[in-house]
Amino acid sequence: EKNIDLNKYTSFIDLFNEGFSKFPDDIAYENMGKSITFKDLDQLSKKFSNFLTHELKLKKGDRLAIQSPNVLQYPVALIGALRSGIVVVNTNPLYTPDEMRHQFKDSGCKAILILSNFAHNLEKIISETEIQYVIVSNMGDMLGSLKGSLVNFVVKYIKKMVPSFSLPGYYSFKNVLSLGAKYEYSQVEVSPNDIAFLQYTGGTTGVSKGAMLSHRNVVSNVIQVSSWMD
């Protein structure tokens, strides 16, 4: 038998903060040949958090939808949102407009980060939701100036994977980080029982339902898996 301390961390952010301090120069994530360290992730997610808190004036408990595949922008946005005490609503990038409408209305999300490839679907239903703020990211936004520009050009103009869309007043992901850099970061107080995620089911027995996952839920699962792997 092995005893584990499920109260070791107050929140999911505490867990990440430990990683940021212990392994600053280690690679945290890698995508399409580009990697970011834990130090990079720490700094970038603070900028994203600052933007949500100071520019959008989002409050603890507000919902942010993230509709993105596995690109480097995703962990930056996810951790940044959690640092602001915001509830993350992960959204399947392959959702139809009808499925998006249901999830966004049901969750009550006020803001969304969406990859430009799917923004045309958001345009169709955004007026029926509570979404006030839209952040649009391009596939190559975190790949560096040269490679990122090339990837974005190929995706949009060669492969034609970004249908035209109109979302007046949206923020670009790069602009979000620039605006967030203006502020000094301050961690929002998050308790173990605060909701971290609204994770929606597959909807195999009806409409998709949002499962409330607290910081304690997620941290406990991480500790359990880590203990089992040891």
What is each model feature region?
Residues T37-K39, A196-I223:
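Conserved AMP-binding A3 loop
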Residues D14-T37, S186:
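AMP-dependent adenylate-forming
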Residues K8, N31-I36, S49-D98, S116:
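Conserved AMP-binding/adenylate-forming
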Residues D42-F48, S178-Y183, A211-D230:
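Conserved structural elements of the adenylate-forming
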Residues G19, Y29, L41, S45-F48, ...:
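Adenylate-forming
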Residues R83-N175:
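Structural core segment of the AMP-binding/adenylate-forming
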Residues S164-Y200, V207, D230:
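Conserved pre-ATP/AMP-binding loop-to-beta segment of ANL
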Residues E1-Y9:
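Flexible, non-catalytic linker and terminal segments flanking ANL/adenylate-forming cores
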